[in-house]
Amino acid sequence: MGFRKHVIEKSEARILAYLHVSFAGIYAFSKTVMVGESEEMRLMAPADAVKVADANRDVIVGIKVRVGKHSSGTSGTQPLDIALQVADETGMPLMCHIDHPPPTYEEVVDRLRPGDILTHCFRPFPNAPCTGQGTVKPAVQRARERGVIFDVGHGGGSFSFKTARTMMANGFYPDTISSDIHTVCIDGPAFDQVTTLSKFLCLGMDLKDVIAATTVNCGSALQRPEFGSLRVGALGDATILSVKKGSFDYIDVTGEHLIGDRKIVSEGVVLKGAMWHPRDNKFAKLA
């Protein structure tokens, strides 16, 4: 597995992966070219995915699939159904991306099992988790009740303040807060993980809950409870954060701006109990 050999094993920071059920994975993904890998059903490789997952259980934490108008096109939920078979065969959780319909939000979450993860959970209309009347869709509530994990995955088209406000007003908070940084959104609106955390802080989520959603809750979702913990005997990995006060302009994928009074800032990283910086490692000369 090239990614393991050339990236994971050479990285000082720990990297875990979800294995895409498409043989090609995500490809042709840029601001000018976008091809949905899940639309081409000939690329679905369930038998190969099971073999690779079984051979790399130390670094592969689950199975991944993307469905929606932009990622699966006319294939609809078929890639999701195949990915669920792989997840069942390997005993691993599934992470499912959702974008524009079809399929609908309801069709996707109705298929997910306890411990499976829906990412881009607070996406805007169309295919938002809430109704136009400001309520949580019944299928979404049922999914949470049976143990489906709702992950933010803030990228270029997958998070809106309106959806977040509506869901949180109904007491429906994300289980995990993550970014989805790629070529389309690294220059905005997502920018980075701490900006995503800051948005939830300024939307009214308690700081302790924001931090839990990016640490201990993530360890639980990964089924790796040793992650996201500072207890005695834990791995000794941590990010040092501070909260700055001021006036900060945040933007979502719809173009809505939120002026917040706080900003979470990364002050440093600790790996295995020691301070770490990417420019101090063996790849510094390439930076």
Model-derived segments and their meaning:
Residues K162-V243:
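His/Asp/Glu-enriched, well-ordered alpha-helical/loop segment
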Residues I8-K10, A53-R57, A87, V109-L112, ...:
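Solvent-exposed alpha-helices and their adjacent loops that cap or buttress functional pockets
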Residues V65-T166, N170-D187:
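Active-site core of metal-dependent hydrolases
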Residues F3, V21, I63, L118, ...:
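Divalent metal-coordination and catalytic microenvironments
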Residues M1-R66:
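Divalent-metal coordination cores built from histidine and acidic residues
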Residues G236-L286:
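C-terminal cap of metal-dependent C-N hydrolases
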Residues R113, R231-L235, L271:
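Residue-level recognition of short, solvent-exposed, well-ordered loop/turn junctions
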